[in-house]
Amino acid sequence: MKFSTILAIPFAIAFANAAAAPAVTAAPAPAADNPYTIYPPVPKTASINGFADRIYDQIPKCAQECVKQSTSSTPCPYWDTGCLCVIPNFTGAVGNCVASKCRGADVTNFRKLAVGACAAAGVWDPYWIIPASVSSALDAAATATGN
């Protein structure tokens, strides 16, 4: 048997199997064991940014300016909540601002709202992804009193 014939046989088998496989023409069906087949709808508009719009009316006044951080240092579209929740350039700037301007329950309430907004956008646990140094600063601000 020729060497070229030996090489052609596996190729022919692989080609026949590929032809028999069903074509992929649609997104996979949702499955309980595959959370990546369903994402929440993302509105492509935002009055402030995708992160701030969801929580702005509920966040403490001391944090309202903080969520208006520019999204230009991120690869995210300004309206994409999920993306903004995981980019340290953005989350770190927001978190540091909140840590410097808010104290006590205001910090705790802000963190809960941020986590909730990010979870609703489909971000994985810990949802609002912030640098460790920012988390420490927020922890300190949450235990502090006064302004």
Swiss-Prot record:
Disulfide bonds join 62-102, 66-97, 76-83, 85-118. Disruption phenotype: Leads to defects in hemoglobin utilization as sole source of iron. One of its GO terms (molecular function) is metal ion binding. The keyword DNA-binding does not apply. It is found in: Secreted. Heme binds at residue 80. Induction: Expression is induced during hyphal growth, by ketoconazole, and nitric oxide. Expression is also regulated by RIM101, TSA1, HAP43 and BCR1. GO terms for cellular component: extracellular region. Keywords: Disulfide bond, Heme, Iron, Metal-binding, Secreted, Signal, Virulence. Residues 1-20 form the signal peptide. InterPro entries: Extracellular_membr_CFEM_dom. Residues 34-145 form the CFEM domain. Pfam families: CFEM (PF05730). CSA2 could be used as a new diagnostic marker of Candida albicans infection. SMART domains: CFEM (SM00747). GO terms for biological process: heme transmembrane transport; intracellular iron ion homeostasis; single-species biofilm formation on inanimate substrate. Secreted heme-binding protein involved in the utilization of iron from human hemoglobin during hyphal growth. May also play a role in non-hemoglobin iron utilization. Heme transfer occurs between PGA7, RBT5 and CSA2 supporting a model in which the 3 CFEM proteins cooperate in a heme-acquisition system and form a cross-cell wall heme-transfer cascade. The ability to acquire iron from host tissues is a major virulence factor of pathogenic microorganisms. Belongs to the RBT5 family. The CFEM domain is involved in heme-binding and contains 8 cysteines and is found in proteins from several pathogenic fungi, including both human and plant pathogens. The CFEM domain adopts a novel helical-basket fold that consists of six alpha-helices, and is uniquely stabilized by four disulfide bonds formed by its 8 signature cysteines. Homodimer. The possibility of a transient honotrimer assembly of the holo protein is not ruled out. This is Secreted hemophore CSA2. It comes from Candida albicans (strain SC5314 / ATCC MYA-2876).
